[in-house]
Protein backbone atom coordinates (compact mmCIF):
# COMPACT_ATOMS: atom_id res chain seq x y z
CA UNK A 1 0.00 0.00 0.00
CA UNK A 2 1.12 3.53 -0.80
CA UNK A 3 0.02 6.05 1.82
CA UNK A 4 -1.53 9.40 0.94
CA UNK A 5 -1.54 11.97 3.75
CA UNK A 6 -3.72 15.05 3.19
CA UNK A 7 -2.36 17.85 5.38
CA UNK A 8 -4.81 20.71 5.15
CA UNK A 9 -7.26 22.75 7.12
CA UNK A 10 -6.58 25.31 9.82
CA UNK A 11 -8.06 23.51 12.80
CA UNK A 12 -9.81 26.67 13.98
CA UNK A 13 -11.53 24.90 16.88
CA UNK A 14 -8.07 24.68 18.45
CA UNK A 15 -7.43 28.43 18.20
CA UNK A 16 -5.26 30.11 19.38
CA UNK A 17 -2.87 27.13 19.27
CA UNK A 18 -3.72 26.27 15.67
CA UNK A 19 -3.58 29.15 13.15
CA UNK A 20 -3.51 29.64 9.40
CA UNK A 21 0.25 30.20 9.64
CA UNK A 22 0.81 27.10 11.78
CA UNK A 23 -2.10 24.65 11.57
CA UNK A 24 -2.48 21.76 13.96
CA UNK A 25 -0.77 19.14 11.78
CA UNK A 26 2.48 21.07 12.30
CA UNK A 27 2.07 21.06 16.09
CA UNK A 28 2.91 18.54 18.79
CA UNK A 29 -0.49 18.50 20.46
CA UNK A 30 -0.24 15.05 22.04
CA UNK A 31 3.02 15.79 23.86
CA UNK A 32 4.88 13.00 22.10
CA UNK A 33 7.78 15.14 20.92
CA UNK A 34 6.75 15.02 17.24
CA UNK A 35 4.43 17.07 15.10
CA UNK A 36 1.19 15.38 14.15
CA UNK A 37 2.22 15.02 10.51
CA UNK A 38 5.53 13.42 11.47
CA UNK A 39 3.78 11.05 13.86
CA UNK A 40 1.42 10.07 11.03
CA UNK A 41 4.33 9.33 8.71
CA UNK A 42 6.06 7.23 11.36
CA UNK A 43 2.84 5.35 12.17
CA UNK A 44 2.30 4.41 8.52
CA UNK A 45 5.88 3.35 7.79
CA UNK A 46 5.45 -0.32 8.86
CA UNK A 47 2.38 -0.84 6.64
CA UNK A 48 3.21 1.22 3.55
CA UNK A 49 5.61 1.24 0.63
CA UNK A 50 6.13 4.98 0.89
CA UNK A 51 3.98 8.04 1.39
CA UNK A 52 2.90 11.21 -0.38
CA UNK A 53 1.84 14.23 1.68
CA UNK A 54 -0.47 16.69 -0.06
CA UNK A 55 -0.48 20.14 1.52
CA UNK A 56 -0.87 23.79 0.65
CA UNK A 57 1.98 25.70 -0.92
CA UNK A 58 2.22 27.92 2.17
CA UNK A 59 3.03 24.93 4.39
CA UNK A 60 5.01 22.72 1.99
CA UNK A 61 8.44 23.85 3.23
CA UNK A 62 7.50 23.37 6.90
CA UNK A 63 6.07 19.91 6.20
CA UNK A 64 9.16 18.93 4.19
CA UNK A 65 11.40 20.00 7.06
CA UNK A 66 9.43 17.89 9.54
CA UNK A 67 9.64 14.72 7.44
CA UNK A 68 13.21 15.20 6.25
CA UNK A 69 15.06 11.92 5.91
CA UNK A 70 11.93 9.77 5.67
CA UNK A 71 11.80 9.57 1.87
CA UNK A 72 8.27 10.97 1.89
CA UNK A 73 7.26 13.08 -1.11
CA UNK A 74 5.54 16.42 -0.49
CA UNK A 75 3.05 17.55 -3.13
CA UNK A 76 2.14 21.24 -2.90
CA UNK A 77 -1.31 22.41 -3.94
CA UNK A 78 -1.10 25.89 -5.48
CA UNK A 79 -4.45 26.89 -3.95
CA UNK A 80 -6.89 25.32 -1.47
CA UNK A 81 -9.26 22.64 -2.72
CA UNK A 82 -10.72 19.74 -0.72
CA UNK A 83 -10.07 16.12 0.19
CA UNK A 84 -11.15 14.67 -3.16
CA UNK A 85 -8.70 16.82 -5.10
CA UNK A 86 -5.84 16.14 -2.68
CA UNK A 87 -6.35 12.38 -2.55
CA UNK A 88 -7.20 12.16 -6.24
CA UNK A 89 -4.08 14.04 -7.29
CA UNK A 90 -1.76 11.85 -5.24
CA UNK A 91 -3.52 8.70 -6.46
CA UNK A 92 -3.30 9.84 -10.08
CA UNK A 93 0.43 10.59 -9.74
CA UNK A 94 1.07 7.16 -8.20
CA UNK A 95 -1.08 5.49 -10.87
CA UNK A 96 0.87 7.28 -13.61
CA UNK A 97 4.16 6.06 -12.16
CA UNK A 98 3.29 2.59 -10.86
CA UNK A 99 0.06 1.44 -12.46
CA UNK A 100 -2.90 0.10 -10.48
CA UNK A 101 -1.62 0.07 -6.89
CA UNK A 102 -3.38 0.10 -3.53
CA UNK A 103 -3.45 3.55 -1.97
CA UNK A 104 -4.62 4.55 1.48
CA UNK A 105 -5.57 8.03 2.65
CA UNK A 106 -4.94 8.97 6.29
CA UNK A 107 -5.28 12.48 7.71
CA UNK A 108 -2.14 14.20 8.96
CA UNK A 109 -3.68 15.45 12.20
CA UNK A 110 -5.15 12.41 13.97
CA UNK A 111 -3.84 10.58 17.02
CA UNK A 112 -3.86 6.78 17.40
CA UNK A 113 -2.61 5.32 20.66
CA UNK A 114 -2.86 1.60 19.77
CA UNK A 115 -0.66 1.42 16.70
CA UNK A 116 -0.67 -2.38 16.60
CA UNK A 117 -4.47 -2.34 16.24
CA UNK A 118 -4.15 0.35 13.57
CA UNK A 119 -1.67 -1.76 11.60
CA UNK A 120 -3.99 -4.78 11.76
CA UNK A 121 -6.88 -2.68 10.48
CA UNK A 122 -4.81 -1.25 7.61
CA UNK A 123 -3.66 -4.71 6.52
CA UNK A 124 -7.24 -5.97 6.59
CA UNK A 125 -8.39 -2.93 4.59
CA UNK A 126 -5.62 -3.47 2.05
CA UNK A 127 -6.73 -7.06 1.44
CA UNK A 128 -10.32 -5.92 0.90
CA UNK A 129 -9.17 -3.11 -1.41
CA UNK A 130 -7.29 -5.60 -3.57
CA UNK A 131 -10.62 -7.37 -4.10
CA UNK A 132 -11.99 -4.18 -5.67
CA UNK A 133 -13.78 -2.45 -2.81
CA UNK A 134 -13.40 1.13 -1.70
CA UNK A 135 -12.56 0.37 1.91
CA UNK A 136 -12.81 2.55 4.99
CA UNK A 137 -11.70 1.99 8.57
CA UNK A 138 -14.53 2.71 11.00
CA UNK A 139 -13.92 3.57 14.63
CA UNK A 140 -15.81 1.74 17.37
CA UNK A 141 -17.70 4.59 19.09
CA UNK A 142 -17.07 5.21 22.77
CA UNK A 143 -19.91 7.71 23.26
CA UNK A 144 -22.90 9.12 21.34
CA UNK A 145 -20.89 11.96 19.81
CA UNK A 146 -22.45 14.48 17.45
CA UNK A 147 -18.99 15.68 16.35
CA UNK A 148 -18.43 12.85 13.84
CA UNK A 149 -20.12 11.33 10.85
CA UNK A 150 -21.25 7.71 11.15
CA UNK A 151 -20.99 4.57 9.03
CA UNK A 152 -23.77 1.99 9.08
CA UNK A 153 -22.30 -1.47 8.59
CA UNK A 154 -24.18 -4.37 7.06
CA UNK A 155 -23.38 -7.99 6.26
CA UNK A 156 -19.94 -9.50 6.68
CA UNK A 157 -17.95 -9.89 3.46
CA UNK A 158 -16.97 -13.45 4.32
CA UNK A 159 -13.61 -15.15 4.66
CA UNK A 160 -10.88 -14.35 3.96
CA UNK A 161 -11.96 -10.69 3.94
CA UNK A 162 -12.28 -9.30 7.48
CA UNK A 163 -14.79 -6.52 6.93
CA UNK A 164 -18.42 -5.64 6.34
CA UNK A 165 -20.40 -4.01 3.55
CA UNK A 166 -21.19 -0.34 4.17
CA UNK A 167 -24.93 0.31 4.05
CA UNK A 168 -24.61 4.09 4.12
CA UNK A 169 -22.69 7.08 5.42
CA UNK A 170 -24.49 9.44 7.79
CA UNK A 171 -23.71 13.11 8.37
CA UNK A 172 -23.06 14.34 11.93
CA UNK A 173 -26.27 13.55 13.86
CA UNK A 174 -27.74 15.38 16.81
CA UNK A 175 -27.12 13.92 20.27
CA UNK A 176 -30.41 12.01 20.40
CA UNK A 177 -29.88 10.29 17.08
CA UNK A 178 -26.25 9.52 17.93
CA UNK A 179 -27.49 7.77 21.08
CA UNK A 180 -29.92 5.74 18.95
CA UNK A 181 -27.09 4.71 16.64
CA UNK A 182 -25.07 3.33 19.54
CA UNK A 183 -27.93 1.17 20.80
CA UNK A 184 -28.09 -0.68 17.46
CA UNK A 185 -24.45 -1.76 17.48
CA UNK A 186 -24.36 -1.23 13.70
CA UNK A 187 -22.74 2.19 13.55
CA UNK A 188 -19.10 3.28 13.56
CA UNK A 189 -17.48 6.69 13.56
CA UNK A 190 -16.28 7.88 10.17
CA UNK A 191 -12.59 8.78 10.59
CA UNK A 192 -12.09 9.59 6.90
CA UNK A 193 -9.63 6.75 6.25
CA UNK A 194 -9.98 5.21 2.79
CA UNK A 195 -8.03 2.36 1.19
CA UNK A 196 -8.59 1.34 -2.45
CA UNK A 197 -6.83 0.52 -5.69
CA UNK A 198 -5.83 3.64 -7.57
CA UNK A 199 -7.59 2.25 -10.65
CA UNK A 200 -10.84 1.76 -8.74
CA UNK A 201 -10.74 5.35 -7.50
CA UNK A 202 -9.91 6.81 -10.90
CA UNK A 203 -12.59 4.71 -12.63
CA UNK A 204 -15.14 5.98 -10.11
CA UNK A 205 -14.11 9.56 -10.81
CA UNK A 206 -14.30 8.97 -14.56
CA UNK A 207 -17.90 7.82 -14.15
CA UNK A 208 -19.11 10.23 -11.47
CA UNK A 209 -17.01 13.35 -12.06
CA UNK A 210 -15.48 13.19 -15.54
CA UNK A 211 -14.18 16.76 -15.58
CA UNK A 212 -12.31 16.26 -12.32
CA UNK A 213 -10.97 12.95 -13.64
CA UNK A 214 -9.66 14.57 -16.82
CA UNK A 215 -8.05 17.39 -14.87
CA UNK A 216 -6.29 15.11 -12.41
CA UNK A 217 -4.97 12.88 -15.19
CA UNK A 218 -3.65 15.91 -17.07
CA UNK A 219 -1.76 17.12 -13.99
CA UNK A 220 -0.47 13.65 -13.14
CA UNK A 221 0.72 13.11 -16.71
CA UNK A 222 2.83 16.26 -16.50
CA UNK A 223 3.94 15.85 -12.89
CA UNK A 224 7.34 14.32 -13.59
CA UNK A 225 8.05 16.54 -16.60
CA UNK A 226 9.20 20.09 -17.16
CA UNK A 227 5.63 21.03 -17.95
CA UNK A 228 4.36 20.41 -14.43
CA UNK A 229 4.15 24.04 -13.32
CA UNK A 230 2.33 25.20 -16.45
CA UNK A 231 -0.22 22.37 -16.42
CA UNK A 232 -0.80 22.71 -12.68
CA UNK A 233 -1.35 26.46 -12.98
CA UNK A 234 -3.76 26.02 -15.88
CA UNK A 235 -5.80 23.06 -14.60
CA UNK A 236 -5.81 23.13 -10.80
CA UNK A 237 -7.94 26.31 -10.42
CA UNK A 238 -10.62 24.77 -12.64
CA UNK A 239 -11.19 21.71 -10.44
CA UNK A 240 -14.46 21.69 -8.51
CA UNK A 241 -14.06 21.41 -4.74
CA UNK A 242 -15.37 18.11 -3.38
CA UNK A 243 -14.99 15.92 -0.32
CA UNK A 244 -14.19 12.28 -1.00
CA UNK A 245 -17.11 11.02 1.08
CA UNK A 246 -19.76 12.69 -1.07
CA UNK A 247 -17.83 12.51 -4.33
CA UNK A 248 -17.05 8.78 -4.28
CA UNK A 249 -17.74 6.91 -1.03
CA UNK A 250 -21.47 7.63 -0.72
CA UNK A 251 -22.49 6.87 -4.33
CA UNK A 252 -20.30 3.74 -4.47
CA UNK A 253 -21.73 2.57 -1.12
CA UNK A 254 -25.23 2.86 -2.59
CA UNK A 255 -24.33 0.12 -5.06
CA UNK A 256 -22.59 -2.12 -2.49
CA UNK A 257 -19.03 -1.25 -3.46
CA UNK A 258 -17.76 0.11 -0.13
CA UNK A 259 -16.57 -2.01 2.78
CA UNK A 260 -15.57 -1.12 6.33
CA UNK A 261 -13.07 -2.60 8.76
CA UNK A 262 -14.22 -1.92 12.35
CA UNK A 263 -11.36 -0.91 14.64
CA UNK A 264 -10.78 0.02 18.26
CA UNK A 265 -7.37 1.69 18.29
CA UNK A 266 -7.46 4.70 20.58
CA UNK A 267 -8.29 7.12 17.77
CA UNK A 268 -8.87 10.86 18.17
CA UNK A 269 -9.05 13.59 15.57
CA UNK A 270 -8.28 16.16 18.29
CA UNK A 271 -11.00 18.21 16.67
CA UNK A 272 -11.50 20.59 19.58
CA UNK A 273 -10.31 21.35 23.10
CA UNK A 274 -12.66 18.79 24.62
CA UNK A 275 -10.87 16.07 22.65
CA UNK A 276 -7.46 17.55 23.44
CA UNK A 277 -8.26 17.71 27.16
CA UNK A 278 -9.16 14.02 27.13
CA UNK A 279 -5.84 13.19 25.49
CA UNK A 280 -3.36 15.58 27.09
CA UNK A 281 -3.90 16.50 30.76
CA UNK A 282 -3.01 19.99 31.96
CA UNK A 283 0.60 20.47 33.06
CA UNK A 284 0.85 19.45 36.73
CA UNK A 285 2.49 22.74 37.74
CA UNK A 286 -0.75 24.61 37.09
CA UNK A 287 -3.34 24.88 39.86
CA UNK A 288 -6.79 23.91 38.62
CA UNK A 289 -9.66 23.74 41.12
CA UNK A 290 -12.53 22.72 38.84
CA UNK A 291 -13.25 19.19 37.71
CA UNK A 292 -12.44 18.43 34.08
CA UNK A 293 -10.77 21.77 33.36
CA UNK A 294 -7.85 22.12 30.99
CA UNK A 295 -5.24 24.87 30.91
CA UNK A 296 -2.43 25.68 28.49
CA UNK A 297 -0.46 28.68 29.73
CA UNK A 298 3.02 29.90 30.61
CA UNK A 299 1.77 31.28 33.94
CA UNK A 300 -0.04 29.57 36.81
CA UNK A 301 -3.79 29.72 36.26
CA UNK A 302 -6.37 29.09 38.97
CA UNK A 303 -9.83 28.00 37.86
CA UNK A 304 -12.44 28.02 40.61
CA UNK A 305 -16.03 26.92 40.30
CA UNK A 306 -16.08 26.45 36.51
CA UNK A 307 -16.26 22.71 35.74
CA UNK A 308 -14.80 21.83 32.36
CA UNK A 309 -13.19 25.23 31.86
CA UNK A 310 -10.67 25.67 29.04
CA UNK A 311 -8.04 28.41 29.30
CA UNK A 312 -5.45 28.75 26.52
CA UNK A 313 -2.74 31.40 26.52
CA UNK A 314 -0.40 32.24 23.65
CA UNK A 315 1.87 35.30 23.27
CA UNK A 316 -0.79 37.25 21.38
CA UNK A 317 -4.16 35.78 22.40
CA UNK A 318 -6.12 34.13 25.20
CA UNK A 319 -9.11 31.81 24.87
CA UNK A 320 -11.54 31.15 27.72
CA UNK A 321 -14.35 28.67 27.11
CA UNK A 322 -15.61 25.34 28.40
CA UNK A 323 -15.27 21.82 27.08
CA UNK A 324 -19.04 21.78 26.51
CA UNK A 325 -18.75 24.73 24.12
CA UNK A 326 -15.48 23.64 22.47
CA UNK A 327 -17.13 23.04 19.07
CA UNK A 328 -18.23 26.70 18.96
CA UNK A 329 -14.71 28.17 18.95
CA UNK A 330 -14.45 27.99 15.16
CA UNK A 331 -17.54 30.16 14.66
CA UNK A 332 -15.99 32.91 16.77
CA UNK A 333 -12.61 32.66 15.03
CA UNK A 334 -14.35 32.98 11.66
CA UNK A 335 -15.66 36.37 12.81
CA UNK A 336 -12.19 37.82 13.40
CA UNK A 337 -11.77 40.56 10.81
CA UNK A 338 -10.21 43.96 10.38
CA UNK A 339 -7.17 44.39 12.64
CA UNK A 340 -7.98 41.07 14.35
CA UNK A 341 -7.89 39.01 11.15
CA UNK A 342 -4.14 38.50 11.56
CA UNK A 343 -4.90 36.37 14.63
CA UNK A 344 -6.68 33.71 12.61
List PLM regions with ranges:
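Conserved N-terminal catalytic core of the sugar/cofactor nucleotidyltransferase
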Residues: 1-5, 13-17, 25, 30-117, ...
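Fold-independent oxyanion-binding glycine-rich loops
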Residues: 7-9, 56-57, 78, 106-108, ...
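A short acidic, often aromatic-flanked loop/helix-cap motif at beta-alpha or helix-coil junctions
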Residues: 80-85, 143-145, 175-177, 267-268
Amino acid sequence: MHAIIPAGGVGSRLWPLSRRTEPKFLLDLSGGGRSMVRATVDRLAPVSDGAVIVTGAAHAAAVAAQVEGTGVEVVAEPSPRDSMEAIGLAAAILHERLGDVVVGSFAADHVITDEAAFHRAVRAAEAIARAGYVTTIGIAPTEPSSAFGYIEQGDALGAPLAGRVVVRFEEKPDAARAAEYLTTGRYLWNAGMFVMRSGVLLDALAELHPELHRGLLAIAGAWDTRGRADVLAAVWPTLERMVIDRAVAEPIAARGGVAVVPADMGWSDIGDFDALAALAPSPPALAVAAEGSWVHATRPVMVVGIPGAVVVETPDAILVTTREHAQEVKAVVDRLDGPLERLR
